[in-house]
Each structure stands twice: as C-alpha cells, then as structure tokens.
From Swiss-Prot:
Sorted UniProt keywords: Cytoplasm, DNA-binding, Transcription, Transcription regulation
GO biological process, one term: regulation of DNA-templated transcription
Gene3D superfamilies assigned: 1.10.10.200, 3.30.70.980
UniProt name for this protein: Probable transcriptional regulatory protein Swol_1435
Intracellular or extracellular location(s): Cytoplasm
Major location category of this protein: cytoplasm
Cited Pfam families: TACO1_YebC_N (PF20772), Transcrip_reg (PF01709)
GO cellular component: cytosol
Amino acid sequence: MAGHSKWANIKHKKARSDEKRGKEFTKIAKEITIAVRSGGSGDPEANSKLKLAIQKAKAINMPNENINRAVKKGTGEIDSETIEEIIYEGYAPGGIAVMLEIATDNRNRTASEIRHLFSKNNGNLGESGCVAWMFKRVGLISIKKDKLNMEEEEFMLKVLDAGAEDVREEDEEYEVLTLPESFMLVKEAMEEEKLLIEEADIVMLPENTVDITDVDMAGKIIKLIELLEDHDDVQNVYTNMSIPDEIIAAL
C-alpha cells in the first residue's frame, strides 16, 4: 500500500501543463467510450463503470461537451475507431514490476512504441503473465485524516458495514480497500456520510512492494514511468516500487 500512496504523491506534485491536461482529457474520453461499450449503456445510473469514468472526468474539469461526445462514440451516435483494451507487463530498472492498462486503436503500433520506451530506458517489455501474479485488482478509496468528519472507530465500522474488505492507515490518510464489484456501493455509502474522498478508483495494487533506496535508481525508474504515463495509449501505470520519503526529497 505504501508504494501506491507515495507514488500517488509524486504524481500529484507534477506540474499540470496544458499539454498534460489535454492528454488527461483524451485518456478519460477513451475510458468513457470503453465504459459505454462494455457496459452496454450510455446512462451512468445504469452503468457503474461509466458513472466512475464521468466522475473522474469532472474531477479534472473536463468540459461537458467532451464527456457527451465520448459517450456518443460509445453508443455509436458518433462514428469512432474501435478501441481495444490490453494489459502489458514488464520490468523497469532494478527489476521493478510494471503493469500497463492500454487503450489503443492499433495494437501493433502501440506494442512497438511501448517496447521501445522500455528498452531505451533500461527496462524491458515482458510476456503476458510475467508480473500479473504480483498484483491484485481492488477498489481503492482514500480519505485524508484531517478531513475525517467522525471518530476513527465509527469511520472504520461504517465503511466495513458498507462492504469494504479492509481499511489501512497511512501517514496522512486512510485507504479503504474493496472488491471491484462492491467499489461503487462503498464509495456511494461514504459519500452519503459526507466523507470527503481524496481519490477513488479500481486499481492494480502490488501484493508486496520493493523499497528503492538508491537515488539514481529511483530517478531512472520514475523517468520510465513518466514516459509511459505520457504515452497516448497508456491509461494507467502500476508498479511494485516503494520510494522512501528521504529518497523522494533527494530527487
């Protein structure tokens, strides 16, 4: 868990340039279109995957026009290319496991470009299944400790009663873990309790993390991760690394 939290902190500190915002819009638009097609409905109240994607779009101030266009691409009201979802697996420098969630209209092009990014940055794209066993798909909902509007014990009981699998305590936040299928139920129960959710998504969490205690190695890994995140077809990047605060501070 610590690996997820610390990496999330790094991402949040990165500058949000106009170019990056544009990339975020493109990726969320793909997620919305895919959610409509896979869920069989353009109605977010009848399609929990779409509901989550739209919530994520609004969280980054994506215009309603963009959201509606992405939904219509999913329903077929607007012509669009076929988008394929793929999982790629590989290794970053230091043997760190990497999982990539891909959304592409050209599998061969994407595979070639991702392989190139790995090989140029001291990593390698692996075979299917090479690192997937190190990760588990879960719902993850985080809430800052200083935003908690009730006693800790009451909070724990409420989220567990709502269907959460576990609640873990980090330095500055609580992380609520759910099964993917109960994620939206738990999230909505927390919202009804007026809990201010910091982050919420279905993610791939590592079963165990690897501490990176060398500054140069941490820099190499982060460089590759950021290049992968910036690729147009990469929706999400997950790793099993954990970088101590003092190493982050030295970067």
